Amino acid sequence: MQKQAELYRGKAKTVYSTENPDLLVLEFRNDTSAGDGARIEQFDRKGMVNNKFNYFIMSKLAEAGIPTQMERLLSDTECLVKKLDMVPVECVVRNRAAGSLVKRLGIEEGIELNPPLFDLFLKNDAMHDPMVNESYCETFGWVSKENLARMKELTYKANDVLKKLFDDAGLILVDFKLEFGLYKGEVVLGDEFSPDGSRLWDKETLEKMDKDRFRQSLGGLIEAYEAVARRLGVQLD
């Protein structure tokens, strides 16, 4: 399957059309951003690591009965995916307090959240992805009530699967975001799952093993990503 025209260039991925109108090529670049794209740097191997990491996670979720857009890997940095009509709202699950939640509520980082919190954010970099709720989604027509309920159900199901997967690898799944779209009327998981869009801490040391290493200038970003991948059993080379 050959990529054709560039359709969209995001902060870390590029989307291309193919000869099949139902399929796209997703290319993972070495770019890393923070502050809604205000700060961007390149890291060798990052595109490859995230592409293979994402394929591994999507495969595990598909095995658990969660529909995903993933078709197959095409190269070290590219995969073939179904073309989705993306919902402009992302789902976030929080198992522990971190990031914007800590700032917003003034609570201690790392406290366990039981049951996990479920948040919705409008995907809009210019507005810094404002937090919204189910009522906004219905009023503005971003997603139907039925499809939003399905997105929430699949997000919690993914959390159950991934918490155990990471726990078995000696990692805490602190929080993560998921994006969904519609494929022939069905709610399907799209975009990616990688350390770019999740928070992962070492169970013993609480060392941060995700993009917070870049956001907080901790260093060792790719080393952390590769360490997480190795613990999970992702084949990188």
From Swiss-Prot:
GO terms for molecular function: ATP binding; guanosine tetraphosphate binding; phosphoribosylaminoimidazolesuccinocarboxamide synthase activity. It is an enzyme of class 6 (ligase). The keyword ATP-binding applies. InterPro entries: SAICAR_synt/ADE2_N, SAICAR_synt_PurC, SAICAR_synth, SAICAR_synthetase, SAICAR_synthetase_CS. Pathway: Purine metabolism; IMP biosynthesis via de novo pathway; 5-amino-1-(5-phospho-D-ribosyl)imidazole-4-carboxamide from 5-amino-1-(5-phospho-D-ribosyl)imidazole-4-carboxylate: step 1/2. PROSITE patterns: SAICAR_SYNTHETASE_1, SAICAR_SYNTHETASE_2. Its EC number is 6.3.2.6. GO terms for biological process: 'de novo' IMP biosynthetic process; cobalamin biosynthetic process. Transmembrane segments: none annotated. GO terms for cellular component: cytosol; membrane. Keywords: ATP-binding, Ligase, Nucleotide-binding, Purine biosynthesis. It catalyses: 5-amino-1-(5-phospho-D-ribosyl)imidazole-4-carboxylate + L-aspartate + ATP = (2S)-2-[5-amino-1-(5-phospho-beta-D-ribosyl)imidazole-4-carboxamido]succinate + ADP + phosphate + 2 H(+). Converts 4-carboxy-5-aminoimidazole ribonucleotide (CAIR) to 4-(N-succinylcarboxamide)-5-aminoimidazole ribonucleotide (SAICAR). Belongs to the SAICAR synthetase family. Homotrimer. NCBIfam families: purC. This is Phosphoribosylaminoimidazole-succinocarboxamide synthase. It comes from Escherichia coli (strain K12). The lineage of its organism: Bacteria, Pseudomonadati, Pseudomonadota, Gammaproteobacteria, Enterobacterales.
